């Protein structure tokens, strides 16, 4: 059963930007679906090695990336984290998105993480 303490520990790991600390939250063969990518689910990372590489790349591009968690919803071996992510990319672009992660756990390890975020459009497209 997922607890609020476990979710706060995962959030603290992500906000530390310590890749090994974050990867330790995942099961060995976990999947992590990023919000952006070439697939309908974004981009699927499979296993700790792929997750480690993607996070290393992300924090290199956005070294001050941080999440402000606003709400956790817990249900058995699943959880949802609602957040705002902020930071500044190497190109100077400000990151400020609202989103959520849907988690599935085995014990206290993440076996699946699916990330969603709002798309900010600066031009009217309607």
Regions flagged by a language model, labelled:
Residues 1-28, 124-126:
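Short, low-complexity N-terminal intrinsically disordered segments enriched in polar/charged residues
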Residues 15-17, 34, 103, 117:
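Generic helix-packing signal
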Residues 1-12, 31-34, 50-54, 109:
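Short charge-dense sequence patches
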Residues 19-21, 27-70, 74-76:
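A solvent-exposed, acidic/Ser-Thr-rich amphipathic alpha-helical stretch
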Residues 2, 52, 56-126:
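A beta-strand edge to alpha-helix "cap/lid" segment located at domain peripheries
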Residues 4, 10, 28, 36-37, ...:
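Aromatic-enriched hydrophobic runs in primary sequence
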């Amino acid at each position: 059963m997922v607890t609020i303490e476990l979710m706060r520990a995962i959030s603290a790991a992500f906000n530390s930007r310590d890749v090994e600390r974050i990867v330790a939250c995942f099961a060995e063969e976990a999947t992590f679906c990023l919000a952006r990518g070439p697939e309908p689910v974004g981009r699927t990372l499979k296993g700790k090695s792929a997750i480690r590489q993607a996070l290393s790349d992300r924090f290199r591009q956005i070294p001050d990336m941080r999440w402000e968690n606003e709400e956790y919803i817990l249900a058995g071996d699943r959880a949802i984290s609602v957040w705002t992510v902020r930071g500044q990319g190497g190109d100077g672009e400000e990151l400020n998105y609202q989103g959520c992660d849907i988690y599935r756990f085995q014990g206290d390890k993440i076996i699946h993480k699916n990330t969603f975020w709002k798309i900010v459009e600066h031009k009217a497209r309607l």
